[in-house]
Swiss-Prot record:
Location of region: G3: 81-84
Subunit structure: Monomer.
Protein's name according to its UniProt entry: Elongation factor Tu 2
Region span, G5: 174-176
Family note: Belongs to the TRAFAC class translation factor GTPase superfamily. Classic translation factor GTPase family. EF-Tu/EF-1A subfamily.
Major site of localization recorded for this protein: cytoplasm
Highest taxon of the lineage: Bacteria
Protein residues bound to GTP: 19-26, 81-85, 136-139
Compartments (UniProt record): Cytoplasm
Annotated binding of Mg(2+), by residue: T26
Name of the top EC class for this enzyme: hydrolase
Amino acid sequence: MAKAKFERNKPHCNIGTIGHVDHGKTSLTAAITKVLAETGGATFTAYDQIDKAPEEKARGITISTAHVEYETSNRHYAHVDCPGHADYVKNMITGAAQMDGAILVVSAADGPMPQTREHILLARQVGVPALVVFLNKCDMVDDPELLELVEMEVRELLSKYDFPGDDIPIVKGSALAALENSDAKLGHDAILELMKAVDAYIPQPERPIDQPFLMPVEDVFSISGRGTVVTGRVERGIVKVGEEIEIVGIRDTQKTTCTGVEMFRKLLDQGQAGDNIGCLLRGTKREDVERGQVLCKPGSVKPHTKFKAEAYILTKEEGGRHTPFFTNYRPQFYFRTTDVTGVVHLPEGTEMVMPGDNIAMEVHLIVPIAMEEKLRFAIREGGRTVGAGVVASIIE
């Protein structure tokens, strides 16, 4: 039988498996591909193929991530699974594999463990919109009351980190039973039930093209007789010729009008998410715009200087710092296209941060930057990346 080709006519969604080490994240990933392969919605990918994930670099950080794809009757999914705990931390903070939702895997035999808690917290901090729980290894628990107890614990933990613990679907099953065909109810049927829950509960993400227009400024030119041209890659949305836009960040917000869009030296009537364009601005001087600002739909993004962030600090082996840092540390924060100096304030009770740590911290930038929650940044010292972070919340 010829391998079924994935049709891209279904809505696409990015998800991943998260949870404590050895609770069965990779086995579950393999089990999903096995069960969905029966209906032609996936190619079965065995555990050992997923487990030896290749390394990738994102924002100067090496991360091991395995990608599998599959589809249900409703959606096409790209699914990420990471071999080690540190890979999850780095992945979620750098957004190397953006997650529109996640499957939290908890072993029914162990209940929630330290990394279960940490992954839920990270999901909250980096803005993963929704979680679905798979209570794995249920074939190892004979007592139904014990299962109920574990489920209650998981719900309480989710609520503690501001997820709707009472409403989140929890599916009980066994990834191993699905892989070994040993128990249809806990194996095959549970996987189908899980995918039904993922389909229904994880909201369909808004496509970048449907979001408000934003383009980071990469370069600025002055073209005699035409005016000022700003180049960059459109991050999201659409800009049409004749539309009013704002220039945000670094200095006071200015209004201007896009009077032309050019791509590959051709004039277009609009530029959209993913396009590398030159945008001609009416009445804007060459010195009014600089790299590091953004062009955006008026009122859609504001400039900010103070925010709370979740960050991962590279180890010395990863090319990071060799020594810890303390409150009032002043590195550069690289947002989109530019470095801005900022001062780090560590949370009370945190004396210092060691290379390899992930931490919550407060940052005060010396100039405002167009910013919103979930925006990723790199932490740099003299052009060398020493960490990565994500804006968790904005203070001012």
